[in-house]
Amino acid sequence: MSPQTETKASVGFKAGVKDYKLTYYTPDYVTKDTDILAAFRVTPQPGVPPEEAGAAVAAESSTGTWTAVWTDGLTSLDRYKGRCYNIEPVAGEENQYICYVAYPLDLFEEGSVTNMFTSIVGNVFGFKALRALRLEDLRIPPAYTKTFQGPPHGIQVERDKLNKYGRPLLGCTIKPKLGLSAKNYGRAVYECLRGGLDFTKDDENVNSQPFMRWRDRFLFCAEALYKAQAETGEIKGHYLNATAGTCEEMLKRAVFARELGVPIVMHDYLTGGFTANTTLAHYCRDNGLLLHIHRAMHAVIDRQKNHGMHFRVLAKALRLSGGDHIHAGTVVGKLEGERDITLGFVDLLRDDFVEKDRSRGIYFTQDWVSIPGVIPVASGGIHVWHMPALTEIFGDDSVLQFGGGTLGHPWGNAPGAVANRVALEACVQARNEGRDLAREGNEIIREASKWSPELAAACEVWKSIKFEFAAMDTL
């Protein structure tokens, strides 16, 4: 080492470990309109001050590492570092805090959810100084939002493609989810669509297994769809699951779906990955396909209250990455979903501008500028008695998806679809006449069942089915 180098080292660099809070805790920082803002629920290890914990999150998810390094002097850390700018104790919780972190926009590649998540929810979640860490919300600034295509088409374009307005759309997941041959699968699709449903759906588990290869399924489902359309005069769709082991295979399946002329395909966006999902979303926009998104694996990430990532963040990420539908819980069915919180992220999916509202778990005002909206899908353990509540909770721009609630009808698949369609039309008519669905829902269904034997049979089968468990995802 030359004497000149030694002199520079002694002046410009001091080795050792520094407290994160000296650099990354900046309570006087005024956030910029271009910053990505994050709200983390932080549970520090005993003895770790909240300021140090919040600063550690900001550091490890941006420019920091565990020790001072030579190359810090070769860039401007003040320009690129994340900053913990506010800390709030969580009411009713001991040693737990909401730490707000601001990230400069230049830290992230344009149009890449993958890159954004690699930083913000990357290695920092394994940091030893923290007992637990959960990302509660993100504010995506318009400057970053505009670098994404977003959903292939959006709510209004889908309505226009289907020529269906003024009511929720109806769907059904084909059951049993695994084991049917392609021809029997197509038969179930036809019966459900003929009975009055708008969509049927591949289960997320269905890709291309030995009992039913994807090409056979696509062919029989397309035949079923066209036959049902010819008989009902309505445009129908089946969510053909294009999820595959490689992006190339996924696109091959999407191309075949387009060649068949079907209106919609499907992707499991978490198990498939954001890079694959964005790739498929771009293909769907370019080729006129709607894109249905399933959220398989989300509960691994979002169900624990103290660690992981809230679904509202995954919902925002999906709106950026691209999808025209996404499953969003039901509030009333068998799957997790507390009402105010669910409606909070439903608004984040559909609306152009959403104000901060902590009572619904929304930590930041979100402006989506020109990104189209996503239709929420209510699915999981729902049946005809739930129809008034679902119509009231989710409104018209939604898909109400009944799997067992269609195929479990005692008279068969088509009568099950008829029962759901009659129940929906009755609820929409009652709402439009000014009736209170929340208070009069059961009576509305009983009245409709008097002139629909299919609905009456469904009401009798599911009159005592309830899923009354407390939601784990509370504020």
Curated annotation (Swiss-Prot):
GO terms for biological process: photorespiration; reductive pentose-phosphate cycle. Keywords: Acetylation, Calvin cycle, Carbon dioxide fixation, Chloroplast, Disulfide bond, Lyase, Magnesium, Metal-binding, Methylation, Monooxygenase, Oxidoreductase, Photorespiration, Photosynthesis, Plastid. Substrate binds at residues 123, 173, 177, 295, 327, 379. It is an enzyme of class 4 (lyase). The modification N6-carboxylysine is found at residue 201. Binds 1 Mg(2+) ion per subunit. The active site is at 175 (proton acceptor), 294 (proton acceptor). The disulfide bond which can form in the large chain dimeric partners within the hexadecamer appears to be associated with oxidative stress and protein turnover. Its cofactor is Mg(2+). The modification N-acetylproline is found at residue 3. It catalyses: 2 (2R)-3-phosphoglycerate + 2 H(+) = D-ribulose 1,5-bisphosphate + CO2 + H2O; D-ribulose 1,5-bisphosphate + O2 = 2-phosphoglycolate + (2R)-3-phosphoglycerate + 2 H(+). It holds the Pfam family RuBisCO_large_N. GO terms for cellular component: chloroplast. The record marks 334 as: Transition state stabilizer. Mg(2+) binds at residues 201, 203-204. Its EC number is 4.1.1.39. The modification N6,N6,N6-trimethyllysine is found at residue 14. Residues 1-2 form a propeptide. PROSITE patterns: RUBISCO_LARGE (PS00157). Belongs to the RuBisCO large chain family. Type I subfamily. Heterohexadecamer of 8 large chains and 8 small chains; disulfide-linked. The disulfide link is formed within the large subunit homodimers. RuBisCO catalyzes two reactions: the carboxylation of D-ribulose 1,5-bisphosphate, the primary event in carbon dioxide fixation, as well as the oxidative fragmentation of the pentose substrate in the photorespiration process. Both reactions occur simultaneously and in competition at the same active site. The basic functional RuBisCO is composed of a large chain homodimer in a 'head-to-tail' conformation. In form I RuBisCO this homodimer is arranged in a barrel-like tetramer with the small subunits forming a tetrameric 'cap' on each end of the 'barrel'. This is Ribulose bisphosphate carboxylase large chain. The gene is rbcL.
